[in-house]
UniProtKB/Swiss-Prot annotation:
Source organism of this protein record: Solanum lycopersicum
GO molecular-function terms, A-Z: antiporter activity; proton transmembrane transporter activity
Location of the protein in the cell: Plastid, Chloroplast inner membrane
Transmembrane segments: 7-27, 107-127
Matching HAMAP family: CemA_PxcA
One BP annotation, GO: potassium ion transport
The family this protein is said to belong to: Belongs to the CemA family.
Top-level division of the source organism's lineage: Eukaryota
A GO CC term attached to the entry: chloroplast inner membrane
Function field: Contributes to K(+)/H(+) antiport activity by supporting proton efflux to control proton extrusion and homeostasis in chloroplasts in a light-dependent manner to modulate photosynthesis. Prevents excessive induction of non-photochemical quenching (NPQ) under continuous-light conditions. Indirectly promotes efficient inorganic carbon uptake into chloroplasts.
Protein name, entry field: Potassium/proton antiporter CemA
Topological category with respect to the lipid bilayer: Multi-pass membrane protein
Main location: plastid
């Protein structure tokens, strides 16, 4: 009976990690054909924001320059001029098709993320008792660690997320969030976020250290300071 009670929260933890993802993945496959049909039949024109329009124009200019260079290398005749125009037309259609697919992927990503968040929220609300048990297990595990181990864990987390080498990691996380949400990444916005977010989190982390850790466990704070020095 005790083993069964211990196994139930672990099964809940595994299900809360994989079940929402599996359901959202299945729904995504089901929505894909419907969104594709709706987008291709219901949209009379492609709507682009400034970032998407700029990106598409840059790709078109690069394509035009490459094709023009290719034709300059060949013999300059009317036949090649016609082939040049046909090549531009085909590649333009391909670029627009890719942009159209990206727009459909954006809608699918956004819809899937809403479904995933709804399932995860509902699952968490219905399983409050199991979450309480998992929380007590985590607290007991941390409580049983030595002060040195706790200080090393704090140092590892702080260096991983807030160290001098963390900006590439933050850039990867921000780009991943952009891709998951289905929003076109803006390089200037990403640069600003990479500069600001680590500073904000570092300030909050240091405030937590000196505001709470000083009263809870001064020895851990002393070990952390000695290790960092």
């Amino acid at each position: 009976m005790a083993k069964k009670k211990a196994f139930t929260p672990l099964f809940y933890l595994a299900s809360i990690v994989f079940l929402p993802w599996w359901i959202s993945f299945s729904v995504n496959k089901w929505l894909e054909s419907w969104v594709t049909n709706w987008w291709n039949t219901g949209q009379s024109q492609i709507v682009l924001n400034n970032i998407q329009e700029k990106s598409l124009l840059e790709k078109f200019r690069e394509l035009e320059e490459l094709l023009f260079l290719d034709e300059m290398i060949k013999e300059y005749s009317e036949t090649h001029l016609e082939e040049f125009g046909i090549g531009i037309h085909k590649e333009t259609i391909q670029l627009i098709t890719i942009q159209n697919e990206n727009r459909m992927d954006t809608i699918l990503h956004f819809s899937t993320n809403i479904i995933w968040f709804g399932i995860l929220s509902g699952y968490s609300i219905l399983g409050k008792e199991k979450l309480v048990i998992l929380n007590s297990w985590a607290q007991e595990f941390l409580y049983n660690l030595s002060d040195t181990a706790k200080a090393l864990c704090i140092l590892l987390v702080s260096e991983f997320f807030l160290g001098y080498h963390s900006p590439p990691g933050w850039e990867f996380v921000i780009r991943s969030i952009y891709n998951e949400v289905g929003v076109v990444a803006n390089e200037q916005t990403i640069t600003i976020l990479v500069c600001i977010l680590p500073v904000i989190f570092d300030t909050c982390f240091k405030y937590w250290l000196f505001r709470y850790l000083t009263s809870l466990s001064p020895s851990i704070l002393l070990l952390y300071d000695s290790i960092t020095e």
